[in-house]
Amino acid sequence: MADIAALTKLIEPEAKALGLDLVRVAFFGGKSDPTLQVMAERPDTRQLDIADCEALSRRISDKFDELDPIEDAYRLEVSSPGIDRPLTRVKDWADWSGFDARVKLAAPLDGRKQFDGRIVASDGDSVTLGVNKLGEVTVPLAQIASAKLILTDALIKATAPLSTEGVDQIVEDAPHRGAGKIQLEG
């Protein structure tokens, strides 16, 4: 398959031209169903809507049709990182400090290859997690094979998109919707 770093260099300017930040570029599916996955987001909202996905997909397709950087047939998938998003950039650790993450390591650290915990701190070289029953664990970023946010009520609340189009009134903590929910009336 094609070199991810080289593909990222081609995709990044297309995302930037639309005001988007790349979150991840990856190949999945193997030879039977090769898929180039591109995750991007708006830096101000950390989200991506359908129009953004369509625009970025068209720009990438046009660029790849011109340069043909991938020899074999593949499927292009452009999406938002989602709520339980991967943590792929140094800035992600600071942006999501205080939220829970699952970190999988390339090699064991203190006899473990996976840690689930709250993101406590990051310094660009490592991340510190508050891990239940272990306390704080500091993991060098270079040892992380993959990491993602863990879906929690706090994460759902923090990332819920709120469209008020056509809404007359916003009622928070509506009793028939449950505590912490927002009901739009209009």
Swiss-Prot record:
GO terms for cellular component: cytosol. Gene3D superfamilies: Ribosome maturation factor RimP, C-terminal domain, RimP-like superfamily, N-terminal. GO terms for biological process: ribosomal small subunit assembly; translation. Keywords: Cytoplasm, Ribosome biogenesis. It holds the Pfam family DUF150_C. The keyword Cytoplasm applies. It is found in: Cytoplasm. The keyword Cytoplasm applies. Signal peptide: none annotated. Coiled coil: none annotated. NCBIfam families: PRK14636.1. Required for maturation of 30S ribosomal subunits. Belongs to the RimP family. This is Ribosome maturation factor RimP. It comes from Rhizorhabdus wittichii (strain DSM 6014 / CCUG 31198 / JCM 15750 / NBRC 105917 / EY 4224 / RW1). The gene is rimP.
